Amino acid sequence: MEEELSGGKRDPQGLLRINATLGFGRTTIAPLVSEFAERYPSVEVQFEVTDRPVDLVKGAFDMAIRFGELPDSRLSARRIMSNRRFLCASPKYLEKYGSPERVEDLAEHRCIIHRQNDDAYGVWRYVVNDHIEAIKVKGALSSNDGDIVLRWALEGHGILIRSEWDLAKYVQSGRLNLVLPNTVLPSADLYVYYPRQTNQTARARAFIDFLVNRFQAPFTPVDVGIEARGRKKRSSRS
């Protein structure tokens, strides 16, 4: 039911359809949906998690919460969290195989491949002078599940690329070490995407503002001894 806001300000109400990535949606966004529902009991939330991006327009979704860049020119986006990517490995792996000294050395190491959407298999990208470069890596283990590849890295199976959100607590505890920490990788900032339109509903605005507030300081950033680079300063774009 569409909220009727005439005659004074009222709490948001009506149907809100939200999409999110499978693992992150289950572990992080779902509890926030629960908290939002307690605050706004007149909003009916349909929350769907998928392993691939969905067509928000065709699927009649109000928004999607995903890491990475804008996938569709028909959408607008608001960044809700900065999130760098790093190369990492366990002390066990580095003790056995050594640590690469240059990006090119990764081609000779055992790398754990996180297969995402239609990305080229085993191609890792990094930034040099504001240009994207690529290197082909190999390894015995790959998966499309982020939690699985992270577990393999913790168990010493190889070098992995993961986001700061996933790595922070393990780097701080010493269970994972950064590899080539001065290498800049494409970021994995967290965005909420929504169909480009002029009249966004009050319930959608309320949920987006709620997310931004909750992600103000979600974790202690990884300390690499240098100022964070490659982070966009804008909090929203369209």
Predicted feature residues:
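Short, well-ordered beta-strand segments
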Residues: R17-N19, A64, I112, L160, ...
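Central regulatory/effector-binding core of bacterial HTH transcription factors
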Residues: Q13-S73, V224-R229
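Ligand-binding cleft/hinge of the Venus flytrap
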Residues: I18, F36, D105, G122-K136
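A local structural motif
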Residues: S42-Q46, H131-A140
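Alpha-helical linker/hinge and terminal dimerization helices associated
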Residues: M1-K9
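Flexible hinge/capping segments at coil-to-helix
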Residues: R74-R85, A89-H114, N129
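Hydrophobic hinge/microswitch elements
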Residues: A134-L178, V184-P186
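C-terminal effector-binding regulatory domain of bacterial HTH transcription factors
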Residues: S42, E164-S173, N182-S238
